């Protein structure tokens, strides 16, 4: 789930914290990628005639196709990816996992009804909702990455937390995920849309943690409390408190304890036995492997091993796999250049620049609303996954 409404809140109140870039602008960067998020995207998006790609025995191969070609694209653009896989979820996430199980049950019932009605659009819709990443998908992805010469890390718990630890330790430049809670875990940089297909033409969105805090005028601890109020994976939120009210409360009272002492409980329903303190602890001190003990190495691809793994029963085209392996080797050999900005120190933004960016964001928002009013808006426009 991530943090509900956080990306929009940052765009509205801390616009300088977001920068849009082309993928090529991350040349020379090492990036920790949320592997489970990627595999889910590939299982959903990589399809043929509406169905997942599959091996001879019917097992899906969409995740392998996506992982192979998107990783080649990253390396081709000079990016050195390291994939981080989820471990066991924390106990505090059991409530969120139970909700997801309920939604899957509902989707299964809806799929059955759509199948009986012969509604192809609804069948595809609910089939996608039932997609989930299994241990076998992850195992196969790790085997593929090993053959490609790309490192991966098994997180003891949450992948986003482990990615953030790698960033904070200077092992990588950024965390790449669609879940905004990478910022709550303290990742200095967060990249969204990095692993999206080229055809979607989505610029990469880069969030800067320091500029988020600066723009929202919060400390790191206050930011964590804000995220808990907005809605996270580890506990319920206060009913009636959305992003706007959450930031108002944090700025007024600075922490959840003081908010609870002053909030009108008749107006805002505080969850019974609300375990926000444990959620806070999970963000401040998550269960991660010490980044200093992790050695990241990118090695030459095993071309014959890739052919053996992907072709045959998995039905990949051998010529394309061999061409992909050659691209991997060429990219590795080319990655000896150094980014120019590694020689220079980046200066922090001035308060005047931040204020100017906020004014510009407000003007853009007003202009967009004005245009919507003139042309009538259209509820079908801009469909897609809602940012978290």
Curated annotation (Swiss-Prot):
Kindly list the GO CC terms recorded for this protein.
mitochondrion; nucleolus; nucleoplasm
Chain residue ranges for the region called I-domain: 122-253
Q: Which residues bind Mg(2+) 1?
A: 34, 86, 158, 160
According to the record, the residues making up region (Interaction with PCNA) are 336-344
Q: Which GO terms describe its biological process?
A: base-excision repair; DNA replication, removal of RNA primer
Task: Point out the gene that encodes the protein.
Answer: Fen1
Q: How does it assemble?
A: Interacts with PCNA. Three molecules of FEN1 bind to one PCNA trimer with each molecule binding to one PCNA monomer. PCNA stimulates the nuclease activity without altering cleavage specificity.
Provide the residue positions that the database annotates as binding Mg(2+) 2: 179, 181, 233
Q: Which organism is it from?
A: Drosophila grimshawi (Hawaiian fruit fly)
Q: What is its EC number?
A: 3.1.-.-
Q: Which PANTHER family match?
A: FLAP ENDONUCLEASE 1 (PTHR11081:SF9), FLAP ENDONUCLEASE FAMILY MEMBER (PTHR11081)
Supply the name of the protein.
Answer: Flap endonuclease 1
